[in-house]
């Protein structure tokens, strides 16, 4: 009899996460997993707890109750440098007070590596994010969309390795300031990277149609609870969205992919 060994899937696992500020529950009993090689979108109305959940999943906040494990190890027990090489976070707002050039900002992502193979990493991620022409510009004078592209390049540089290992990339509204071309380019790039490497991407998105087009799974957060989780077809239906967003909307099918697309009624 042949012993068919099964390769374990690299996971980030959260179990019964709670997070309270004073007497208010911002996150309430959330359990989930994110596997390398998939793209996950977190959606939900304003105040649902999306950014707070992202900070819990990345170790920037410690839960009031519950645990979060990355590759089987509690996030709180990771060494900072090892964690920085395994997961990266692009926050919603990234203002700088000093006159750093774009290339210097992106190079900050290489801090955990001590200069190892920086040039190759920087050239690759700047090309991927359409930042080469911005390299010598002062980061502070860029448009909001240009700054988002630079921050994406920085976190990609942080996770770049010559021999890719399982890694997790978290992004908080990475397309909020981008024009249509760069929204499409960015999400195509992120999805492509999850197919080519053992990389997981988890991003908070407000645009439900972008989530439908590019995410493998969608997690709907409302009032601090994970109220729906599944494929775009499973989560993005009119009944569920109307219940939690309280908007007068409809759901149709994309003419090419047949994925759900959401529209507001007049």
From Swiss-Prot:
Entry EC number(s): 7.6.2.-
Pfam families for the chain: ABC_tran (PF00005)
Keyword Translocase (UniProt): yes
Keywords, in A-Z order: ATP-binding, Cell inner membrane, Cell membrane, Membrane, Nucleotide-binding, Translocase, Transport
Residues that, per the record, bind ATP: 44-51
Subcellular location per the Swiss-Prot or TrEMBL entry: Cell inner membrane
One Gene Ontology cellular component: plasma membrane
Lipid bilayer topology: Peripheral membrane protein
GO molecular function: ATP binding; ATP hydrolysis activity
ABC transporter domain span: 12-248
PANTHER family from the UniProt entry: HEMIN IMPORT ATP-BINDING PROTEIN HMUV (PTHR42794:SF1)
Entry function: Part of the ABC transporter complex HmuTUV involved in hemin import. Responsible for energy coupling to the transport system.
Similarity-based family: Belongs to the ABC transporter superfamily. Heme (hemin) importer (TC 3.A.1.14.5) family.
Known partners and oligomeric status: The complex is composed of two ATP-binding proteins (HmuV), two transmembrane proteins (HmuU) and a solute-binding protein (HmuT).
Protein name in the entry: Hemin import ATP-binding protein HmuV
Organism of provenance: Yersinia pestis
